[in-house]
Curated annotation (Swiss-Prot):
This is NADH-quinone oxidoreductase subunit A. It is a multi-pass membrane protein. The keyword Transport applies. The gene is nuoA. InterPro entries: NAD(P)H_OxRDtase_bac/plastid, NADH_UbQ/plastoQ_OxRdtase_su3, NDAH_ubi_oxred_su3_sf. Gene3D superfamilies: NADH:ubiquinone/plastoquinone oxidoreductase, chain 3 (1.20.58.1610). Belongs to the complex I subunit 3 family. It holds the Pfam family Oxidored_q4. The lineage of its organism: Bacteria, Pseudomonadati, Pseudomonadota, Gammaproteobacteria, Enterobacterales. NDH-1 is composed of 13 different subunits. Subunits NuoA, H, J, K, L, M, N constitute the membrane sector of the complex. It catalyses: a quinone + NADH + 5 H(+)(in) = a quinol + NAD(+) + 4 H(+)(out).
Amino acid sequence: MQETECCGVLSYIVGSVFLCVFMLLCGYFLGGRSYSRFKNVPFESGIKSVGDARARFSVKFYLIAMIFVIFDVEGIYLYIWSVSIQETGWIGFIEVCIFVFILLISLIYATYVGVFNWKNRLNEYSRVDSLYIGRSKFFKNDK
């Protein structure tokens, strides 16, 4: 290695170490201190814990997360198509139109079933029951 390359690597290492030490010292001198009995409680840093860590979430949060991931991955497919649009031509355009049409149908179906509806419907049949089991949403005593 030449002398200039060694100086560049050495100055990078010295600068990185100096930056790390500087940030640690700033945190030590400028940071607050806690001397309470909750100092060693995990993840709380001296603040009294409130509540239980085992909080339950509604299933609707997981449904929204799954729908987000599905549509996000499909967005990646559309990005890949948009990068290679010249190679695919009209056939690729028609395939993407069919793909987007299927996406829109699935989004309309999810809206119809009530995935995005967060109201409680305790006395009504859900639309999923009426679609799969054959129950009518108009007649509540249908069995």
